[in-house]
Amino acid sequence: QQANYRYGFEPVRKIAFSSAPPPRKPQERQPVAAEPYTSERGWGWLEGQAAVTLEATGVEGAVYGSRATGSAPAVFRIDIPAGHYYLTLNFGSATAATGPLTIHVNGEERLAGFGLEPGRFRALPLWVTSRGDAIDIGFSAAAGASWQVNALTLSAMGTLNEDYTLTRPWWRFEH
């Protein structure tokens, strides 16, 4: 059987939507503002980047210190090999509400009407499967409203041709 990772273990991708300087170490969170997607970089805004802005959240830190926001739908792409992943999205602000917003992953709606009150923060994990060479994460809000996201982390869980336990519940038994 042939694995579909580019490396022995696919690295964790950490993105913080901020204007901080580039990280000194590769495992640190990569700051991203409104950079468009390029295949050389392997990440960036695929659609809607012209309307993406950064706003402070009233707290310090790489994850929750600032966030990307937009009033028009936008799509963020990360190049990855096909496989199963945990996508953790971070939301919140000390000074303003978050959402309500809708999240699509590879065109599939994964979260609708999500929102937080000012002063609330949340890390939201999603199980995602990529059958291609990228994951596209879409952000949108109702007309006249804005979407927001602070950071994201993409962690590899397994390749598509690994053990079936990643896709089938182990507790299912035939009678």
Language-model features, listed with the residues they occupy:
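Compositionally biased, intrinsically disordered or flexible polar/acidic segments
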Residues: 1-175
